[in-house]
Curated annotation (Swiss-Prot):
Residues with site note (Positions MEP for the nucleophilic attack): 152, 205
Entry keywords, A to Z: Isoprene biosynthesis, Lyase, Metal-binding, Multifunctional enzyme, Nucleotidyltransferase, Transferase
Higher taxonomy: Bacteria, Pseudomonadati, Pseudomonadota, Alphaproteobacteria, Rhodobacterales
UniProt cross-references to InterPro entries, sorted A to Z: IspD, IspD/F, IspD/TarI, ISPD_synthase_CS, MECDP_synthase, MECDP_synthase_CS, MECDP_synthase_sf, Nucleotide-diphossugar_trans
Native source species: Jannaschia sp. (strain CCS1)
Family per similarity comment: In the N-terminal section; belongs to the IspD/TarI cytidylyltransferase family. IspD subfamily.
Signal sequence, start to end: none
Protein name: Bifunctional enzyme IspD/IspF
Pathway assigned to this chain's UniProt record: Isoprenoid biosynthesis; isopentenyl diphosphate biosynthesis via DXP pathway; isopentenyl diphosphate from 1-deoxy-D-xylulose 5-phosphate: step 2/6; Isoprenoid biosynthesis; isopentenyl diphosphate biosynthesis via DXP pathway; isopentenyl diphosphate from 1-deoxy-D-xylulose 5-phosphate: step 4/6
Family matches, as Pfam families: IspD, YgbB
Gene: ispDF
Physiological role: Bifunctional enzyme that catalyzes the formation of 4-diphosphocytidyl-2-C-methyl-D-erythritol from CTP and 2-C-methyl-D-erythritol 4-phosphate (MEP) (IspD), and catalyzes the conversion of 4-diphosphocytidyl-2-C-methyl-D-erythritol 2-phosphate (CDP-ME2P) to 2-C-methyl-D-erythritol 2,4-cyclodiphosphate (ME-CPP) with a corresponding release of cytidine 5-monophosphate (CMP) (IspF).
Enzyme Commission identifier(s): 2.7.7.60, 4.6.1.12
Length: 382
């Protein structure tokens, strides 16, 4: 009878403190498609049919971040050190002496079960293995100018997980007290031969802000979280000599009436954002019964909605506003309105449309009793 394979351990190294990926916190705790990067990476190994014992190495200050995460109950959590090597050593310290270990960077949440299996099979067969992709781009040498080229034959882009015999890699790390690019370098310095198995372009390492969108597309199968919100508002004319529309003062024989400055354009855009977020409307956040909002400038409301969207992880990608009125004429000030709206939404003016129409003299707008506005906003999760 064939002897069953020994159970393997997976060490997820997640003790880093770097925040260059943005977000104001270590990247492994940021969320992608509703889950933290830690959850994605840990559960990749927990879901593998090999039945890994999973060890998560974190910084001591991050212990509280585990609360409420979707992690396996069998997960072992240990505290890492001041360097990656120290964190790997902490993880290896709790591994059993026999068997094999796969060491994985938490910042690669898109690793496939196939890559994990390939590394595990090659490690069991030869004692050590790691995934990599051949370098296909031309390589240059130089600083601000090209001083030469580099032959790319035999060059590889390293990935994780990197697999080893537990005892061998533990001894290699114990003997190594310097810096190393990864565990393969530590292993080679100890005389361990490491096999190369095919890597995967999807197994990207999240390093900069732009990598989050790529990772989300990979993890969700390209099914991005896109929201569309609609807004509609009406304000009647009253005494005055100007109207505020889209943050621009437009001279007119009458003004618009309202609790605030009655900017029907900004109100409609604000409600469209709240609608896309399922966050009610302006009245929910700025009740007209509250005297502090009497005669308030409407950009306050729109800025609140924009910041709420950003805090929820959404970017505004498009805004389309239609003003419905007979007077005043919108065409002469439409460009200024677009620029002001783009500034408030924090997007390029090319993503903002402000246009006007009439109701062919029908209804209250046709009778010039007021102005109506309709807006559509598109939000995309970052």
């Amino acid at each position: 009878m064939e002897k069953p394979a020994q159970r393997a351990t997976a060490i997820i190294v997640a003790a880093g403190r770097g925040i260059r990926a943005g977000g104001g916190e270590p990247k492994q705790w940021r969320r992608i498609a509703g889950r933290s990067i830690v959850e994605w990476s840990v559960n990749r190994f927990a879901a593998h049919h090999a039945g890994f014992d999973v060890v998560l190495v974190i910084h001591p200050d991050d212990e509280w971040r585990l609360n409420g995460l979707d992690l396996p109950t069998t997960l072992r959590v240990v505290h890492g050190g001041d360097s990656r090597a120290a964190s790997v050593k902490a993880g290896l310290a709790v591994c059993c002496d026999a068997g094999h270990v796969l060491i994985h960077d938490v910042a690669r949440p898109c690793v496939s079960l196939a890559v994990i299996q390939s590394v595990l099979d090659a490690t069991r067969a030869g004692g050590a293995a790691a995934p990599a992709l051949p370098v296909t781009d031309a390589l240059w040498r130089g600083d601000t100018h090209v001083s030469g080229t580099q032959n790319r034959d035999g060059l590889w882009r390293a990935q994780t997980p990197q697999g080893f015999d537990v005892s061998a890699i533990r001894a290699a790390h114990a003997a190594h007290d310097g810096t190393a690019a990864d565990d393969v370098e530590v292993a080679r310095l100890a005389g361990i031969d490491v096999a190369i198995v095919p890597g995967d372009e999807a197994n990207l390492k999240i390093t900069g802000p732009e990598d989050f969108a790529r990772a989300e597309a990979l993890l969700t199968g390209g099914d991005m979280d896109i929201r569309v919100g609609n807004g509609f508002d009406v304000h009647r004319f009253g005494p005055g000599d100007q109207v505020w529309l889209c943050g621009i003062s437009v001279p007119h024989t009458r003004g618009l009436q309202g609790h605030s400055d009655a900017d029907v354009g900004l109100h409609t855009l604000t409600d469209a954002i709240y609608g896309a977020l399922a966050e009610g409307d302006i009245g929910t956040h700025f009740p007209p019964s509250d005297p502090q909002w009497k005669d308030a400038e409407s950009h306050i409301f729109l800025t609140h909605a924009v910041e709420l969207a950003a805090n929820r992880g959404f970017s505004i990608t498009n805004a389309d506003l239609t003003l419905i009125c007979e007077q005043p004429k919108i065409g002469p000030v439409a460009s200024a309105m677009r620029a002001r709206v783009a500034d408030l939404l924090r997007i390029d003016v090319a993503r903002v449309s402000v246009k006007a129409t009439t109701s062919e003299r029908l209804g209250f707008t046709g009778r010039e009793e007021g102005i109506a506005a309709l807006a559509t906003i598109t939000l995309v999760a970052r």
